[in-house]
Design a protein with these regions (language model features):
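Structural marker of alpha-solenoid helical repeat scaffolds
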Residues: 61, 94-96, 129, 158
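Terminal, low-structured helical/coil segments at or just beyond the last alpha-helical repeat
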Residues: 142-178
Length: 178
């Protein structure tokens, strides 16, 4: 015949097991958060090789991790590998269209490449994902200001250039310097 521990002992053991599982989960999550913090810090400090090594290590164990892939794109861009960074972000936007950050970051790279139409489309997708995403709203405003500046400058260079076009260009230019 088997004997079972008293009910109190069983519930105490169960509680200890639950606490142990919760503790392990907390440790795993905090360790994972530390990886992101470490990579972010390395990027901020310009230590792109070390950041790349840590992001590669994380992506080997979790290749679809969107947060680390976003950080990876920043590393690649900082290393002058903008084409690869664009590829990472384009892939992220296809796999995770609900995340606004990859759309926004992709728009920044597109704008830097002179692909204004693509940048605007990407920012609009970011805003579809999260309409109150202020970074994307500001970036979209900056793109439109830049386009307005170009148009006013062109208008100011025509033979019958209205003075208002030059005034508007002069008013917009300092806004884009900030």
């Amino acid at each position: 015949m088997r004997t079972f521990p008293p009910l109190f002992f069983r519930s105490a053991c169960t509680s200890l097991v639950h606490l142990f599982v919760v503790g392990l989960t907390w440790l795993a999550l905090s360790a994972r958060a530390d990886v992101y913090d470490d990579v972010e810090r390395l990027i901020r400090n310009g230590q792109y090789e070390r950041a790349s090594e840590q992001s590669d290590a994380r992506l080997k164990t979790a290749p679809s991790d969107p947060q680390m892939r976003l950080l990876r794109s920043r590393i690649l861009d900082a290393q002058g590998k903008t084409g690869e960074a664009v590829g990472v972000l384009e892939s992220l936007t296809l796999e995770f269209p609900e995340l606004p950050e990859p759309h926004n970051n992709l728009a920044v790279l597109y704008a830097r490449q002179g692909r204004t139409t693509d940048a605007i489309a990407s920012l609009n997708k970011a805003l579809l994902a999260r309409p109150d995403y202020t970074v994307a709203l500001e970036n979209l405003g900056d793109l439109h200001l830049g386009l307005a500046l170009q148009v006013y400058q062109r208008a100011g260079q025509t033979p019958a250039a209205p003075a208002s076009a030059t005034r508007k260009a002069s008013a917009i230019a300092p806004l884009l310097q900030r």
